[in-house]
């Protein structure tokens, strides 16, 4: 069973520059090796001894940059535990184990399942039911980790590969699948979270945000803010896509491009029609009216270092050598907050001014009245774009005043989108330098997982019942 996809859509929400945010942030801690601990809480009259929940998650991914997203496993797991307790599962019946690699995780799951099966066989009176919650450790690149931990990956492998690293990975993955299949055969329930496993069908799959959804969300926000539906092909919007992608992983092998391709697929499913109709253009020419989702590589770049982000954007704008005149840019899809932050820095260094708040605001007379009476926020109506781009209007465009005026227009700050809700990105969102970010609703996600576990505990037969049957 898979939790319905709309559940993910409801959990995923965007934080916009115009939104008033109240956020509670917990202290951060790192987990660099396998950890196991039982969560203790006083027994209550309502708590149930109906079964155990064992949670296996990755240790938090470590990025080279100190900038990290809020969507970390170390923040989600306590929420799941808390939600399980709220659903009357005893703290003593909840176990959490974290591992930094698929190899370590597969061994941890295998050890638990084998030990549990042996102890159940030795204890004829055992009536414990067990649900395993497993978020398989994905082999991700640095650029993939920039999106945070709450994103879905399909874990696949080639068992016949001649590459030694690939063989080790396949062995770990197959060990995990075998352990989970043994668990199911012994009556345990398995809930897979976020990542799928090649050749394994869990009792329940809880999806998280996909790469395609990340791309779609940002593109839709950009289309809405720039009002592309009202844009004329004679005065198109100038848009760049900065797609982070590591061509090689940490071991030097060719990296899996699936995630980067998925992000661009989502972006292009929204922006493609506007480029085709001429309502959107790319200043760098990396995207054209004939581009397809297969052209993702044209906008991909290595974003492991901040200077690469900045130099790539300057190059796209043709300002890597000459910064005397600005290139018009209306929107930048940065894909994640790491890229968005350095894109904002570079635009500031290049002399772009203003903020996202200056683009298509909307204030009306009725809005002023409603604002005074407290019915709704004040919104400013935007001035319509001219039918033609300023540089194509009639008149003497060779004068110095006209040139300066055009450069002033071109230097206006663009819409910048991101993803991951980095703590470091919040100031940019507040001051309008970054238009939006997004993240999963952690509490809702934890509640979904906890309620699924409770349902499985109450509906699955106990080991004693299975022996009788």
What name fits each language-model region?
Residues 49, 173, 177-180, 206-238, ...:
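Hydrophobic alpha-helical segments within soluble ligand-binding/sensing domains
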Residues 68-86, 104, 214-218, 255-286, ...:
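Short, solvent-exposed amphipathic alpha-helices that sit
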Residues 42-83, 87, 93-120, 135-140, ...:
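Extracytoplasmic "Venus flytrap"
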Residues 149-166, 176-212, 244, 425-428:
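Flexible loop/hinge segments that line or gate small-molecule binding clefts
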Residues 161-171, 198-224, 251-259, 431-443:
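Short beta-strand elements at the ligand-binding edges of bilobed clamshell
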Residues 458-467:
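Conserved small/polar residues in nucleotide/adenosyl-binding loops
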Residues 28-36:
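Bacterial lipoprotein signal-peptidase II cleavage site
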Residues 131-150, 166-182, 294-409, 414-424:
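Hydrophobic alpha-helical
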């Amino acid at each position: 069973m898979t939790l319905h996809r709309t559940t993910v859509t409801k959990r995923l929400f965007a934080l916009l520059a115009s939104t008033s945010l109240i956020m509670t942030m917990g202290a951060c801690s790192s987990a660099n090796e396998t950890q196991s601990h039982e969560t203790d809480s006083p027994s209550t009259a309502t708590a149930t001894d109906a079964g155990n929940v064992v949670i296996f998650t990755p240790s938090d991914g470590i990025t080279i940059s100190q900038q990290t997203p809020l969507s970390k496993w170390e923040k989600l797991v306590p929420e799941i535990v808390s939600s399980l307790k709220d659903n009357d599962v005893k703290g003593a019946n909840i176990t959490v184990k974290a591992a930094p690699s698929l190899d370590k995780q597969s061994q941890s799951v295998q050890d638990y399942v084998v030990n549990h099966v042996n102890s159940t066989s030795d204890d004829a009176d055992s009536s414990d039911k067990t649900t395993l919650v497993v978020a398989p450790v994905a082999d991700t690149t640095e650029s993939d980790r920039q999106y945070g931990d709450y994103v879905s990956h399909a874990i696949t492998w080639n068992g016949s590969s001649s590459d030694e690293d690939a063989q080790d990975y396949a062995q770990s993955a197959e060990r995990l699948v075998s352990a989970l299949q043994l668990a199911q055969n012994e009556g345990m329930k398995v809930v897979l979270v976020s990542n799928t496993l090649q050749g394994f069908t869990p009792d329940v799959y809880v999806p998280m945000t996909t790469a395609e959804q990340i791309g779609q969300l940002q593109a839709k926000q950009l289309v809405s803010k720039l009002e592309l539906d009202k844009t004329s092909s004679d005065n198109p919007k100038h848009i760049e896509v900065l797609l982070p992608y590591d061509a090689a992983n940490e071991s030097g092998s060719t990296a899996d491009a699936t995630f980067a391709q998925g992000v661009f697929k989502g972006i292009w499913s929204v922006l493609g029609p506007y480029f085709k109709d001429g309502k959107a253009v790319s200043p760098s020419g990396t995207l054209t009216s004939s581009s397809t989702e297969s052209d993702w590589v044209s906008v991909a770049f290595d974003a492991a270092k901040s200077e690469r982000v900045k130099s790539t954007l300057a190059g796209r704008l043709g300002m890597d050598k000459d910064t005397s005149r600005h290139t018009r840019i209306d929107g930048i899809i940065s894909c994640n907050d790491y890229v968005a932050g350095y894109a904002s820095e570079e635009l500031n260094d290049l002399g772009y001014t203003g903020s996202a708040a200056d683009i298509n605001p909307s204030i009306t007379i009725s809005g002023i009245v409603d604002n005074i009476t407290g019915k709704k926020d004040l919104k400013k109506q935007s001035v319509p774009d001219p039918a033609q781009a300023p540089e194509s209007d009639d008149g003497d465009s060779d004068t110095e005043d006209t040139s300066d005026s055009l450069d002033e227009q071109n230097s206006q700050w663009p819409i910048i989108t991101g993803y991951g809700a980095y703590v470091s990105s919040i100031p940019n969102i507040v001051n309008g330098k970054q238009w939006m970010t997004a993240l999963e609703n952690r509490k809702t996600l934890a509640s979904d997982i906890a309620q699924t576990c409770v349902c499985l505990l109450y509906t699955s037969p106990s080991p004693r019942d299975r022996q009788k049957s």
